[in-house]
Amino acid sequence: MEREVKDFVAACATGVRSKDLRQRPQGLLLPLPTPSRPWSHQSMDFVTGLPVSEGNSVILVIVDRFSKACRLISLPKLPSAFETAKLVFLHVFRVFGLPQDLVSDRGPQFSSCVWQAICQLIGATASLSSGFHPQSNGQTERVNQEMEATLRSLVADNPSSWSAKLPWAEYAHNVLQSSPTGLSPFQCQFGFQPPLFP
């Protein structure tokens, strides 16, 4: 039966169209060090250019580099550095604790003096990915690709409904086994596997 499911999924036209092609990056890229606990090291990015859905057009993607878990937060517009800090505190820090390191791109939210001051205040380093090598924030870029493919599949018939489906995309990512850890992000964080869809 497992083989039949894999064959069915591989033949699904919507799924095939939704997946991105992947190529190896050029040049020597070294992986970031493996953190010692969940949510101590985080990567974040914004996904923009989405159709307006329930008043939202932006997604803040936050990835735990230890468990590979993600938080996906829909927003009406790109937030300021201070608004970003408030969102990250509300959705991540207050639940999982303060991080030691935050990796992000060089967007104005993350390269501002406000963001740097907030990171210093909580005792975290703010690491900016190279402008010429966005792969240095590769875990978040990978989650972005997976999330976009999942959303395309979920909203193929109504693209403007992505905001309502975003929690399902987050759940799907967090309960599926991650190849680097051999566990689902959920299991890696909490020690048990939640039920999959009935």
Please describe what each predicted stretch is.
Residues 1-198:
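Integrase module of LTR retroelements
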